[in-house]
């Protein structure tokens, strides 16, 4: 069997089993994994049952309940499937996360229905990233089927599926936990992504909670209190002014522009007739790969402290909620990039650029352990196009079919 005919055999197997792949994804979408609250062990159990039908015994690695609850989640089990072929060769891991933000409002399709309309599968996590549970599982199944054919190329090494359930909170209880426990150390990694680019770098993220303390008072005698909300407005204005300055700092990574800051949540006050005594802000600061996280955090704390000092009477507590470092490409990722670009060009009929993304992902945790990695999977050109984290999230099924072929072909290249 020639290499070209091996690629054709992979493609043909995926086409023949594509209806099954769609049903597999529907079954995954139909089990909610809203995070918060993050009660995601039931989804891992369902996934393990589905994988067992393929002849795979998924290892169930339950994170201890106390760790999970201290982290702010409810239940969490990570899965590893290990499929060994001939001796020697690399181990390539494929990682996708099953946790996802709650659906919110405005849906015209059931968020957990997995409904297929006009070639699109709708549902929360259909694009990010239960889609790549399907991409990676069926790419591996296609490789297994090829290996069983007479005259097929000798496949050496192995593939691991890492299906994890902590990406929304930063990944430390997902891939981070598996890596810290010494449960895996692959040679290469492909993580869930989209189909029209291969991502080798991404932004970092700093999330902080800012608590502004004032003094409650009756609204009829406001001079007897200290308005924490007015103090918070001063801090907000300083942060937004700083955000405007970030546009002058640009990244050299294609696909990444400049740093930015978002205040995503504000809580405070007790009633309309009470001067607010406490206000809590939660902010998200995206860091380009060229930035130093320590410097960024120190600068945010400086801006907050200087602003607070201009409003007499308030005190401020600042707590770090999350620090996710940016993804810096490792030199060893070249075989991954080249294979995905080659097969993406063939299957999609267009160039697959090597890009960065303003998102942050679990991939950084693998790279921090020296594991070369890229981000690639089933999905559209942009996050916005997929409606991820918005109503009516969907996946174009032809993207799923083609991305599965690209990943299967890439695995063949890496393991022969």
Positions of predicted regions on the chain:
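Acidic/His- and Gly-rich active-site-bordering loop/insert found
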Residues: 2-121, 145-155
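Glycine/charged-rich beta-loop-alpha catalytic/anionic-binding loops adjacent to active sites
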Residues: 111-125, 213-214, 388-389
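Metal-dependent amide/peptide-bond hydrolase catalytic core
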Residues: 1-9, 33, 70, 194, ...
